[in-house]
Regions:
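Short cysteine-rich loop/turn motifs with clustered Cys
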Residues: 2-33
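Positively charged, low-complexity intrinsically disordered regions
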Residues: 14, 36, 115-117, 121, ...
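Short recognition patches in nucleic-acid-associated and regulatory proteins
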Residues: 28-48
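Short Cys/His-rich local motifs and their 1-3 flanking residues in nucleic-acid-associated proteins
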Residues: 25, 64-67
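Polybasic, low-complexity binding patches
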Residues: 41-59, 66-131
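Bulky hydrophobic/aromatic packing residues
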Residues: 20, 80, 134-138
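Arg/Lys-rich, low-complexity, intrinsically disordered N-terminal tails that contact nucleic acids
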Residues: 1-9, 120-138
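Cys/His/Pro-rich metal-binding microdomains
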Residues: 20-22, 59-63
Length: 138
């Protein structure tokens, strides 16, 4: 785990809260990962930001649920992805996880789920996994 990830977990008291920047349950600290918010990792080096692991550019998400789900949303509905990202940027600026931001994120996720509940991948499996819905705390 990167040092910035550890620092943000501590600063935002994520283990004590028990949920990440999108309101997903945290079971194990090792499951958490850094998500690039403003400058995608693929663009960071060209902009002189190294790999972009900077506090102002990140949120902490549960890799197997919220992080993977967010990238699925990015691929399917860029507007919803940007709306969720905006809420997480706001939390980053505030320096804390805010219940109103988390509620707006939940509303966006529920809208995505209504629109894409029957979408399937190339292998015929539903794109929205049960854990994406069940492991939300908000």
């Amino acid at each position: 785990m990167r040092e910035i990830t550890k620092e943000m977990i501590k600063e935002y008291r994520l283990m004590k809260l028990g949920y990440d920047f999108m309101g997903y349950e945290i079971k194990n600290k090792q499951d958490l990962s850094f998500h690039h918010l403003i400058v995608p990792r693929r663009n960071c080096e060209a902009l002189g930001l190294g790999e972009g692991y900077l506090k102002w550019n990140g949120s902490i998400l549960n890799q197997n649920t919220s992080h993977d789900y967010l990238h699925l949303i990015e691929a399917k509905d860029l507007d919803m992805f940007m709306a969720i990202t905006s809420e997480m940027i706001d939390q980053n600026i505030k320096g804390c996880l805010d219940i109103e931001n988390l509620r707006r994120i939940r509303d966006i996720l529920e809208c995505f789920e209504r629109e894409h509940s029957s979408d399937r991948g190339k292998k015929g499996k539903l794109l929205i996994k049960d854990d994406y819905v069940r492991r939300r705390k908000f």
